[in-house]
Each structure stands twice: as C-alpha cells, then as structure tokens.
C-alpha cells in the first residue's frame, strides 16, 4: 500500500503497489477546516461528498456512481439530524438506489424527558417515517428491562432480567430474555462465562471452559451430542471429539476431527483439517482449503475469488477493505456501505434495506417493500425473523461455533433448499454476522471466519495485546470462546452478552471510527460487572 500526502502531511491518494495512482487509486480532498470533504474511489468509479454544519458535525454523506466528477448518477445519501442543544443524534435519513428504484426511510430517536423522571441520555422511542417501532423501559440503574415492539397495531414485548452478585452489587449480565413467546435463561461460571442456556425452562446447552476461558466442552441437548475441544499451548485447536449427549461422564468418542499445524516457521498456520491439506500464499492467505474450496487474493489480504463445486464467486472492496460487490455464478449483488456500515444491497430484483436502532443494532429490514424484524438471543445471534405483524416466518439454529444447523419456517419445516424463502434471503445469522452461503464463511469486514473449523481463514491485521496470551494467535476466533464473545470486524473480541443492553455506551453516532474508539475505551469491554456496580 502506498500513500501520497499534501503539504500538511495528510494522505490525499492511496494506491496499491502495481497501480497507477492517477487511474486506480483513492483520492481525498479536505475542506477549509481540515475535514474530509470529498472522496474519489477510482476503483469503483464512485464519488462521495461530505457536508458539515457550523459546529463541524457531519450532516450529509452523498455518493454518486459512474463518474468521478459531478456527472455521476445518484447512488446513496445519508443525512444526520441533531438535537439543538446537544450533539446527540436525533434522526438519520437514508436514501438508496436499489436496482432501478430508490428507497428512502427516516429513523428518529426520542430521548428521555427529565421532567418526566426519565434519563435524559437514554433513548425511549425509535420511529421509522414517523411511525412508532420500538419503546424502551429502564430500571433505576439504566438497564433496559423491556423493549415494546409496535407491529401491525399490536404490541410485542421483549423483557430482560439481570444477574445479581454479592455485596449489594448488580450487573448487566443477562439472566433471562423473554422474546416472542420464548424465554431464554442463562447461568454463568465464576469467570462470567455462559455455563447453561435454557429455553422455556428446558436445558438446551451446557458449556465448560479452561483457565484461559477457552471452550473445552459443549453438551448440546438440542443436537443430542456432546463435544470436547483440545488446544495446544498457543491456542490452536488440536481436535474436536464428538460423543453421545450427556452432561455427566463421557463414553467413547464416536467421531474425532483432527487439526494439523506442520509449518515450521508459522506454527499457528492450519495446514490440515480432517485429513484435508490446506495450502497458503506467502502471507498466510489460503489457496486450497477444506472441502475443495480454492481461493485467490489481491492487495494483500483481500479475498478476490473462491471456487467450490465448480461455482466461482468473486468480490470487490472499497478503500477500507469493506465489500462493495460480489458475483456468484454470474449473479451480482451490490452493497451500499456508508460510514463503515452496510445499509442496503440488491441482487437483480431483490432489494434489502437495513434499519438500525440507537445502539447501532440492525433490528429490521425492508425486502421488496415489506418490513421484517430480526429476533435475537442474548448473545446477538439471529434466531428468527418475523413479518410486520410479529408472525414468526423463519428460525435458525447454530452449533457452538456458529455453524448453521437448521433453517426452518415458522412452523419448523426445513426451508434450507428454498433460496427464495425469507430465511435464505436474509444473510445475517450467528452474532449478526453476514453469512456467505456460497462458501459457508462469515464475512467480518476485515476477514472471513470459518465456523466449520472455528478459526479465521487468514491472519489478523492487528497484533496481540500485552498480557493477553490468547490474543497473540492471530487466527483464533475470540480466543476460542465462541459462546460468550463476538468479533464484529475481525480484529478484536467483545462480550456478546452485554451488548445492546446499556443505554449510553453504544449510542449510534456518525463515524464508525468514533464508535470503535468508544467501544475500545469503555471501562472494560469484556466485563459486564464493571459497567454498573
């Protein structure tokens, strides 16, 4: 990667080694206040203009396509509105060109009224185009206790309770989630890891961890199987053993999957899986992978294409490495990524527009003119989809590492082979990650995660943290704790069970970098107890 700078040492052109920066780079123009005013993406022939108010707050992002000057066609616009006396975001208006037509939605937030004994820094209502979608209730510690969904004139409550600890202290660790008629209950070990999950009082999952908080055993009543995981000293998975389901003493393993690491220089490089050889390029990108997958790469760590069962998929990205297009067997999907967030996509006549709440959670989407809602468990997995009236249309289940197990309709019928069913139209699954059906991988922005192996397919671009042994394995997913953690951009893990519950820490705000810094600088992104004591 190469850069050119202006007289103030600001990057104005970014380009790759073999490219001519004048016809294949990314160009940035700054305004008089030193803020980014214009961005030209020569690779994708897109031009993005940024507009600010007198307080230097970002108020509009407008993108054209097909021309790098003002002659391009409209592609997208994202406008922000703020409260008069604060920097709090009160609304955002999204307009996208999806295929041959445009879609426009305004999402607004209502904050607490101090005269009504409400917290003024908490959102109490979320609206779309003026219509009420979500109403929140909080306890005296600012924890969300209920989300009331407004659906087709009816109210559907989602209720939360929390775990208490000794010495009159409490936490934001979720104890129960009552969600669309199903109650999920959680218990934790002494380190705060999820120990059991029950659905409507019936035990579903039991988990065990080692002293490094790595998952070492999962007893899944839902799968009627138990699994044992072993690791080497560097945090590499050595084997997965499958047993008949039990929460007690294990019998004889019925299946063993072995992992191999034979590279003498790069000891964390997975070179074999279940007897299949895996090969890499010089910087640790896989070329031949499990189950016949083959891959090509560009610009360092960008996955350019993969082939499976004779079908080839290719991918394009923007300057930040975020995906803008994929083509699978000749079928093209275009993505609208603005401010680091995927707001919409279209494939032929299929159009999806994603809606976000005050915490930045994708909670609903518009598909070909109809509204659908996501149903989440406590860890942020998408476990269902409802229509605009709250009727369950789709359900998903996953194994401990996020591999999809079942895809059914609301009545429990298998629809995994029905590409047109809303369950398969929706790409967001485990932890809210984007699932690529063509590969079985999750796209986590900076790289791809393989739930089959429980590892990232290539190396992390961010080094480990001092004092955290597991973080130095740059292929390990969430330091081998897939139950309690999530990694939204493939670079750092966070506590999954705490997100989306706090009122102030995760407010949506223009600027994905600002959101990331806010998350990284929280009292402890790993410890729910430190949020409220």
Task: Give the residues covered by each predicted segment.
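Beta-turn initiation residues at beta-strand->coil junctions
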Residues: 1-8, 13-20, 38-44, 48-50, ...
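A motif-centric feature for acidic-aromatic and gly/ser/thr-rich catalytic loops and repeats
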Residues: 3, 90, 111-115, 159-166, ...
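A residue-level detector for well-ordered beta-strand positions
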Residues: 3, 28, 50, 80, ...
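Short, acidic, Ser/Thr-enriched surface-loop or helix-capping motifs
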Residues: 6, 31, 53, 83-84, ...
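Glycine-centered positions in the ABC transporter ATPase nucleotide-binding domain
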Residues: 9, 34, 56, 86-87, ...
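Low-complexity, glycine/serine/proline-rich disordered segments
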Residues: 24, 76, 105-106, 133, ...
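Short, low-complexity export/processing leader segments characterized by acidic and small residues
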Residues: 323, 385, 403-413, 447-457, ...
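Short linker/helix segments within small regulatory modules
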Residues: 465-470
């Amino acid at each position: 990667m190469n850069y050119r700078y202006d007289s103030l040492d600001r990057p104005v052109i970014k380009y790759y080694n073999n490219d001519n920066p004048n016809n294949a780079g990314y160009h940035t123009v700054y305004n008089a206040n030193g803020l980014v005013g214009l961005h030209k993406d020569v690779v994708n022939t897109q031009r993005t203009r940024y507009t600010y108010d007198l307080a230097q707050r970002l108020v509009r992002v407008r993108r054209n396509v097909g021309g790098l000057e003002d002659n391009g066609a409209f592609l997208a616009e994202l406008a922000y509105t703020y409260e008069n006396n604060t920097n709090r975001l009160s609304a955002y208006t999204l307009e996208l060109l999806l295929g041959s037509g445009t879609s426009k939605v305004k999402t607004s937030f209502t904050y607490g009224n101090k005269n009504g004994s409400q917290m003024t820094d908490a959102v109490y209502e979320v609206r779309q185009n003026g219509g009420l979608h979500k109403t929140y209730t909080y306890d005296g510690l600012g924890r969300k206790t209920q989300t009331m969904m407004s659906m087709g004139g009816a109210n559907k409550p989602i209720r939360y309770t929390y775990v208490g600890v000794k010495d009159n202290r409490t936490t934001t660790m979720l104890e129960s989630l009552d969600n669309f008629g199903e109650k999920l209950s959680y218990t934790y070990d002494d380190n705060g890891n999820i120990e059991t999950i029950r659905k409507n009082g019936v035990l579903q999952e039991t988990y065990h961890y080692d002293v490094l908080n790595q998952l070492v055993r999962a007893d899944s009543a839902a799968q009627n199987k138990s699994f044992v995981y072993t690791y080497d000293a560097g945090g590499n998975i050595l084997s997965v053993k499958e047993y008949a389901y039990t929460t007690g003493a294990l019998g004889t393993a019925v299946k063993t999957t072995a992992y191999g690491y034979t590279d003498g220089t790069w000891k964390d490089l997975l070179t074999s899986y279940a007897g299949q050889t895996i090969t890499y390029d010089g910087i640790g990108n896989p070329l031949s992978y499990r189950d016949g997958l083959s891959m090509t790469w560009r610009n360092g760590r960008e996955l350019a294409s993969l082939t499976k069962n004779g079908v080839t998929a290719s991918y394009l990205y923007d300057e930040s490495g975020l995906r803008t297009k994929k083509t699978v067997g000749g079928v093209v999907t275009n993505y609208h990524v603005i401010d680091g967030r995927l707001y919409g996509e279209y494939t032929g006549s299929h159009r999806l527009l994603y809606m976000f709440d005050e915490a930045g959670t994708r909670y609903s989407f518009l598909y070909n003119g109809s509204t659908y809602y996501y149903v989440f468990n406590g860890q942020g997995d998408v476990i269902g989809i409802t229509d605009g009236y709250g009727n369950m249309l789709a359900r998903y289940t996953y194994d401990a590492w996020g591999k999809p197990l079942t895809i059914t309709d609301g009545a429990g019928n298998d629809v995994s082979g029905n590409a047109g069913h809303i369950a398969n139209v929706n790409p967001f699954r485990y932890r809210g990650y984007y699932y690529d059906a063509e590969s079985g991988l999750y796209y986590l922005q900076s790289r791809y995660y393989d739930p089959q192996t429980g590892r990232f397919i290539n190396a992390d671009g961010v080094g480990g943290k001092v004092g955290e042994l597991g973080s130095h394995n740059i292929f390990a997913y969430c330091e081998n704790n897939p139950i309690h953690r999530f990694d939204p951009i493939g670079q750092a893990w966070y506590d999954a069970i705490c997100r989306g519950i706090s009122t102030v820490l995760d407010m949506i705000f223009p600027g994905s970098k600002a959101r990331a810094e806010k998350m990284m600088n929280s009292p402890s992104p790993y410890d729910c107890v430190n949020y409220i004591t």
